[in-house]
């Protein structure tokens, strides 16, 4: 045996083994460095510490998990574990493993038209949310994920350049969606996926959480594959009261689910975050606020209007302007005002900060019918807002200044055919229309107006009760419970005459309440008939004889009513045989 050859062979084997171990060590070190770097990137989002290796293992083994509430895409909110987002493809990704959960499991119905709405604007085709699907094994071939350790709420802002949309479509829905889920607390992070920049009022969104909101474009700077360890996607629509006319002309929603109580709680939360307090004013220090616009839809005789208001109501008048004052300063002023006067516009959403008993006065340019544009009237009229509302419209064409030469989105019409321009100029009122580019609507709404003070003051005198903020109290909205122990007795007086006596006990909660007026509603229906006879009664028993027939079966329902309009539930039906 050649000893040198054997030794050389052994040496080569040892060196090869050492090199292999070195390469594995370098790879392992590189992997650790990469994971450390990705951990650092993940923690750039948050102070929350993350076990990167544990998170990656959870994603690889368990995949994505989704559980949703709501039956339709228009009312669905989904909770995800390890929902990912590919910043290059601009797509959300659901990774499947044997442990994945997808409820509801809709199959291809998920695309008809979408899993859910990302904004609170219902069924708008620019606001749909869906995801792509991949097996978890595909992670081996993809960039290493960067994990977002915060609980996140993922949504679209609808129009962050417009105050009405910011409050109605974004802030209120986000606030109450966060109230709905306990882990969407002050430490949660908002993620805006609509693709807009911050916008002029981004500070308002910052008030909802202690964490800086993330924009879609910012996600690209953190990595190619972002994975949200725990996220909620979508918004509650329960707080919205207005639809913008995408399918039918704009107006109040058919089924409004929010009251002034919830609006005022949200307004108080926002004021607290802005460090605004509602200080008690002196009895004689009520004042009127006039919203001043500086670029379009101007009040041309603003000084005269201020003087007329001061003389009519014997109050001082002040002006506020979004262009000239900070938002929190404006809210501080409005929150103690007796009246808010403004041309129609997004700034009127600030009326939600008015004290109870205050008045909202909305002015409309020539040709614009106030009954067709009512977001602020609807807000003021919500039960529990306790605001008075009056609308004034300019009916004098000589008191309007038009701008046909402006760009189309500022009301210009010179780009239209001459015949169409002439029709718009001759029109006395904008016909009902869909959103959002109706040229006649834009032409009229961007006019400047000289307010006819005589008609303006007449409208205020007719429409407003005496302004008295100090006595404005929260109206009770407590509903009665079911009446207790309902009973019926019958008797036959003759072959064609019978009596039906009904009695009951008061609702259980009534003994704990102070109610001005308590009445009872009784419905009587002959079995087999489609119609019934309703009765409103002041007492807890009554004997009916009119239209009561012998040897007949009657169905009887009873309920309690507080203060004429607070209806309780019906008690179980009584079956009464004469």
Swiss-Prot record:
GO terms for cellular component: endoplasmic reticulum; endoplasmic reticulum membrane. It catalyses: 3-O-(alpha-D-mannosyl)-L-threonyl-[protein] + UDP-N-acetyl-alpha-D-glucosamine = 3-O-(N-acetyl-beta-D-glucosaminyl-(1->4)-alpha-D-mannosyl)-L-threonyl-[protein] + UDP + H(+). The chain crosses the membrane at residues 5-25. It comes from the Eukaryota. Residues 1-4 are cytoplasmic. Residues 482-578 form the Fibronectin type-III domain. CDD domains: FN3 (cd00063). It is found in: Endoplasmic reticulum membrane. It holds the Pfam family Glyco_transf_61. Pathway: Protein modification; protein glycosylation. Keywords: Endoplasmic reticulum, Glycoprotein, Glycosyltransferase, Membrane, Signal-anchor, Transferase, Transmembrane, Transmembrane helix. Glycans are attached at residues 98, 275, 541. GO terms for molecular function: acetylglucosaminyltransferase activity; protein O-acetylglucosaminyltransferase activity. GO terms for biological process: brain development; muscle cell development; neuron migration; protein O-linked glycosylation; protein O-linked mannosylation; retina development in camera-type eye. It is a single-pass type II membrane protein. Belongs to the glycosyltransferase 61 family. O-linked mannose beta-1,4-N-acetylglucosaminyltransferase that transfers UDP-N-acetyl-D-glucosamine to the 4-position of the mannose to generate N-acetyl-D-glucosamine-beta-1,4-O-D-mannosylprotein. Involved in the biosynthesis of the phosphorylated O-mannosyl trisaccharide (N-acetylgalactosamine-beta-3-N-acetylglucosamine-beta-4-(phosphate-6-)mannose), a carbohydrate structure present in alpha-dystroglycan (DAG1), which is required for binding laminin G-like domain-containing extracellular proteins with high affinity. This is Protein O-linked-mannose beta-1,4-N-acetylglucosaminyltransferase 2. It comes from Danio rerio (Zebrafish).
């Amino acid at each position: 045996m050649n000893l040198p050859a054997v030794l050389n062979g052994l040496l080569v084997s040892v060196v090869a083994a050492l090199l292999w171990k070195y390469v594995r060590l370098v790879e392992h070190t590189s992997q650790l460095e990469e994971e450390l770097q990705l951990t650092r990137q993940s923690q750039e989002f948050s102070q929350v510490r993350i076990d990167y290796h544990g998170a990656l293992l959870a994603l690889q083994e368990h995949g994505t998990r989704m559980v949703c509430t709501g039956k339709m895409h228009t009312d669905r909110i989904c909770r995800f574990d390890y929902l990912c987002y590919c910043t290059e493809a601009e797509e959300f990704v659901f990774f499947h493993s044997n442990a994945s959960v997808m409820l509801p499991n809709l199959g291809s119905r998920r695309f008809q038209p979408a899993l859910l709405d990302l904004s609170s604007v219902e069924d708008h085709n620019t606001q749909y949310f869906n995801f792509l699907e991949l097996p978890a094994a595909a992670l081996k071939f993809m960039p290493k994920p960067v994990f977002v350790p915060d609980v996140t709420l993922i949504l679209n802002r609808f129009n962050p350049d417009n105050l009405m949309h910011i409050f109605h479509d974004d802030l209120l829905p986000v606030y109450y969606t966060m109230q709905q889920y306990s882990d969407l607390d002050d430490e949660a992070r908002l993620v805006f996926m609509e693709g807009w920049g911050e916008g002029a009022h981004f500070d308002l969104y910052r008030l909802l959480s202690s964490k800086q909101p993330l924009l879609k474009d910012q996600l690209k700077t953190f990595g190619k594959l972002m994975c949200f360890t725990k996220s909620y996607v979508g918004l509650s629509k329960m707080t919205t009261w207005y639809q913008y006319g995408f399918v039918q002309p704009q107006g109040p929603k058919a089924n409004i689910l929010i009251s002034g109580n919830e609006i005022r709680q949200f307004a108080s939360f926002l004021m607290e975050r802005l460090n605004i307090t509602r200080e008690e004013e002196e009895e004689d220090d009520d004042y009127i606020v006039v919203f001043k616009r500086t670029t379009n839809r101007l009040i041309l005789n603003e000084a005269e209007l201020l003087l007329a208001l001061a003389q009519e109501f014997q109050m001082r008048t002040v002006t506020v302007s979004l262009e000239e004052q900070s938002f929190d300063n404006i809210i501080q002023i409005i929150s103690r005002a007796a009246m808010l006067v403004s041309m129609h516009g997004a700034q009127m959403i600030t009326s939600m900060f008015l004290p109870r008993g205050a008045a909202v006065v909305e002015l409309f340019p020539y040709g614009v019918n106030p009954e067709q544009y009512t977001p602020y009237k609807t807000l003021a009229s919500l039960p529990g807002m306790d605001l008075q509302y009056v609308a004034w419209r300019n009916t004098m064409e000589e008191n309007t200044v038009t701008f046909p030469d402006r760009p189309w989105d500022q009301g210009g019409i010179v780009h239209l055919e001459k015949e169409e321009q002439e029709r718009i100029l001759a029109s006395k009122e904008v016909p009902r229309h869909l959103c959002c580019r109706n040229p006649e609507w834009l032409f009229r709404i961007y006019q400047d107006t000289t307010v006819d003070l005589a008609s303006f003051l007449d409208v205020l005198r007719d429409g407003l009760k005496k302004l008295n903020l100090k006595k404005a109290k929260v109206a009770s909205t407590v509903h009665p419970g079911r009446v207790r122990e309902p009973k019926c007795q019958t008797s036959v007086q003759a072959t064609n005459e019978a009596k039906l006596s009904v009695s009951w006990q008061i609702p259980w909660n009534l003994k704990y309440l102070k109610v001005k007026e308590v009445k009872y509603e009784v419905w009587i229906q002959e079995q087999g008939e489609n119609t019934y006879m309703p009765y409103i009664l002041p007492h807890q028993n009554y004997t009916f004889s009119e239209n009561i027939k012998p040897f007949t079966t009657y169905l009887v329902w009873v309920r309690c009513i507080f203060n004429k309009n607070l209806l309780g539930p019906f008690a179980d039906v009584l079956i009464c045989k004469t």
